[in-house]
Structure formats: structure tokens, C-alpha cells
């Protein structure tokens, strides 16, 4: 089976590419290359790659493709607020355009990496479910993901299976690591500085999931019967996969023996708190999605990865692992223009 994977040179994509190839899939990666050189360790390189903006994909790029896993886009709320219009152009309109092109060219399945951010600020007394919970997207990133989901689902039919997966905040090692996401940030802070400072009171809730379990979810969208996954959305997480920031910080501290954990409480309670229900993916896709990673295993993996790669505070706080810093660096150095188009092949 030939898989076109957009965002193959990103945080999740670098891991997913390796897993797909190990499983015998033929992978074509499509990525604009903004983060291609932001590497720790050795990402897999021996596969077919196109360096191209997803806004520019054309029919010949899809020749012989059976399924698309669409990860590419501006990857979180801070990046989304960099330019709300561009966020909509890329994450919403670019996604819908690609899905339409896929359907026109006989692609059988379209798997979309969506987001739980579309739920917005919510009450924590009830876990958020895929269909019944209100969608209240606040940021440009969240709005774009929600708008794209609705549009591409309208394209689904018996011959074009559309599935949307909404991952929890991801953690875990990757050759293109991100440290602008909560658990990776906490473990990296403990490892490089010897301490973790939490400015809130630690009570906000955050669902998190390991990058390899997220990859497993996307692959389940390739192999599960269309009757289960077509025109449907799935929250991606693990059993009991909602944690307070205090839980996450304690797990990070435990991953780095000797590190110090301090709750300053100076910002009080964070309004960004939510809990998510994972019953659908854990029951309906249980034959295909079998999460294997918890916080302590993931924390141990991160520390081992840091030791193997010579990870330091310069990586943790710099553009190697902070996506918005890299994007600003590319613009400041005239590598890309203000529409996030490449000015030079030397990225």
C-alpha cells in the first residue's frame, strides 16, 4: 500500500514514517522542510520525499497513492496566532483542497490529524466526547481544525473514507523533538536545569498521549473497517489519560532523579483546563489501537534520548525544539516570506 504522508519531517511525522516503513508500507513524504534540519539523533532518510508546500500539491503527486495521512500544517495555538489568516489558509483551506484532490484522484482513505483544541474552555466535571460535547474553538488553530473537519467529512462516501483523529497533547522522543508541549517541556527542564517551576497551582487538567500511540491511532485509520472509521472523529488518548499539571510535573520529576519541583502558584489557577473521553477509540478500535505508553515509560525514554543525543539547555530553549522560534528565524533570515513561502532552497 502506498501512503502519502504530509508533515513527514515534523515531530510526529518523523516517528510515523519509520513505523510505516517498518510495517511494509511504501511512504511518500510531503513536507515544506521548515524543520528538516532541526534534528536530534538520526531520522530515517531512505524513502521518497517531496519538498513542497501542501498548498501546492497537484494530481501527479498523488499518482498511485492509496491513502493519505495528513499531518502537515501550523502545529499549535502559538503558531496559529502568528498569522490567523495563514493558519486558515494552510490548516483549513489547504486541508480541504488536498482532500478534494485526493478524492478526484482515486485515493481511498484520507486520515486527518485534527485537534482537541476545538473544544475550547470547558467545564471539567464531564469528559469531552467527540460528537456530543460543544465545540467552542477560541484560537485560529482550533477554528481551522474544526472547520476543516466539517468540510472534509462532507466529502466522504463509500469510495472515499475520511477519518479525523484528535490527539491529546503529545509527548515522547522524536528525531525532531518539540519542547513547546507540556510533558516534553517539563522533562527537558528537569534534565537541563535540575528543577521544574510550575507557575500555576497545578490543578488544571491536561490529556496527554505518547507519540507512538498517536502513530498507532493513525495506522488504525488505515486498517480498520470503513464501517467503523468513515466520516467519524476519534479522541486519541489512553485509559485514564487525563492528568493534572501537578501529576505531569511529578512524573517529570520522577523521570529525572534529583531534580527539584517547585509550585510557585503566582498565576493562580489556569483557565485552560479540560478532560477528554477516550471511550470511542478504546472500545470501537480496540482490535487496531492498543496504546502502550504511560508517563513514566515516556519520561524514561526522553531522558535516555537526551543522554544519547547530548541534549542541553540550548536545544531545550532554542529553535531546535521550539517551533515558533524556528519559524521566526526563517523569516528573519529571509528563508521564507511573510506568507510562509520559501525564498531559498537553503532551508
Show where each model-derived region lies.
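Conserved glycine-rich Rossmann-like NAD(P)H-binding loop of the short-chain dehydrogenase/reductase
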Residues: 25-34
